[in-house]
Amino acid sequence: MTAVSTTATTVLQATQSDVLQEIQSNFLLNSSIWVNIALAGVVILLFVAMGRDLESPRAKLIWVATMLVPLVSISSYAGLASGLTVGFLQMPPGHALAGQEVLSPWGRYLTWTFSTPMILLALGLLADTDIASLFTAITMDIGMCVTGLAAALITSSHLLRWVFYGISCAFFVAVLYVLLVQWPADAEAAGTSEIFGTLKILTVVLWLGYPILWALGSEGVALLSVGVTSWGYSGLDILAKYVFAFLLLRWVAANEGTVSGSGMGIGSGGAAPADD
């Protein structure tokens, strides 16, 4: 019992300097973080230029939501690079790495918790959906990210890690339902169905990669190393966030008349106002 307590204490007492040294000694992990920081910086400047001439309120809201994606990402990845949001976890019995200290870049979940709702907000605004549907998508998304974080941080039970993973996936299914079933009809009515369809497929396909990486990486069955998993997440972030946001903002800037023409449907699903 004493040995177990001592080991647990040692893990908890790892300093940020220890974590930073471990990050910097892992080329794959370190490079996956800094490449994302550099790209986020470039994307922020690009998006500022792309959105500077937007005038309609709805187009501006989409632009703000889009801008927040790289802004959140660069902040969160800076936390990873500094070791602030990275730690060592001792995997529980039953895990493939049971008893070993595993580096956990848990700060990624902060990125997703704050950036993915902005992606959904931008998509909802593009589709001119109603506020109830938008609220559902965003809250289910936050639930997905928070329970995913719980699955990654639990060290007391291997089973409970997978239980929370399953709960996170259930939240994800709710998000997929909104994206694939509810919002396409709203986008059709708003006249944005073509670009919405492209971004919807891009989002769904790429977001499916995250739970797969979790399951295959050190947090799951440990078939992939921490560095390889980190590059997988970074690659998905680049495509699902920066490429997605660029395509959306470019379309909005070129079709602002369509965006402003369908009005601010949030809260009404784009429905026309009732006669007096």
From Swiss-Prot:
The modification N6-(retinylidene)lysine is found at K241. The keyword Transport applies. Its main location: membrane. Signal peptide: none annotated. GO terms for molecular function: monoatomic ion channel activity; photoreceptor activity. Residues 22-25, 82-105, 155-157, 217-225 are extracellular. Residues 1-21 form a propeptide. It is a multi-pass membrane protein. Keywords: Cell membrane, Chromophore, Ion transport, Membrane, Photoreceptor protein, Receptor, Retinal protein, Sensory transduction, Transmembrane, Transmembrane helix, Transport. Belongs to the archaeal/bacterial/fungal opsin family. Light-driven anion pump. This is Halorhodopsin.
